[in-house]
Design a protein with these regions (language model features):
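Catalytic domains of riboflavin
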Residues: 1-197
């Protein structure tokens, strides 16, 4: 079976395991490797960078982004899926250049730390927060909203780490390659549409 049951994916997510989330074939038709932000570590971020190969982003609720004064990157969003990137950041404390897996994990942890203030973040940086659509998956069936929904269902802090899965040929990984990836690393695959039901 290609796709896993949502409850099994949630149990894995709760334990700090990765999941693969695929959106609709008529949308981006792409897969992201997803992890709960509170479960991230330098080793897990390094795994994403090395094996998923996409851009490491952090879906977050608007309330927290407002607390950190992280405005949207573009005033007028012309990207076709309306992915809501904020200005990128690095944690100032405990990091060097911000790009290493260690530094990126440190920044992600800082974003979800209630004690982090706007002044604790350098801008621009190497981590890209994404603003969750407050109407959720019913309004925007994207990886950002799906990742936050997984956090909620797993009763974890509502922030995640996502990274697109790019194939060895440099193009977006499709189902055949995703199956191999999932089997090799023991990761479950779910469809966003299953989270909406």
């Amino acid at each position: 079976m290609t796709f896993s049951k949502i409850k099994d994916a949630i149990n894995d997510f709760k334990k700090g395991k990765f999941g693969i989330v695929i959106d609709d074939k008529h949308r981006e038709n792409e897969a992201d490797l997803v992890l709960a932000a509170e479960k991230c570590s330098p080793e897990k971020i390094n795994f994403m960078i090395k094996n998923a190969r996409g851009l490491v982003c952090v879906p977050m609720l608007g309330k927290r982004l407002d607390e950190l004064k992280l405005r949207l990157m573009a005033k007028i969003n012309t990207e076709f899926t309306k992915c809501a990137f904020t200005i990128s950041v690095d944690a100032k404390k405990g990091t060097k250049t911000g790009i290493s897996a260690y530094d990126r994990a440190k920044t992600i942890k800082a974003l979800i730390d209630r004690n982090t203030k706007p002044s604790d973040l350098a801008k621009p940086g190497h981590i890209f927060p994404l603003r969750y659509n407050k109407k959720g998956l019913s309004k925007r069936a994207g990886h950002t909203e799906a990742a936050i929904e997984l956090c909620r269902l797993a009763k974890l802090y509502p922030a995640a780490v996502i990274c697109e899965i790019i194939g060895e040929n440099g193009k977006m990984a499709k189902m055949k390659e995703l199956k191999r990836f999932a089997k090799k690393w023991g990761v479950r695959i779910i469809k966003i549409q299953e989270l909406i039901r």
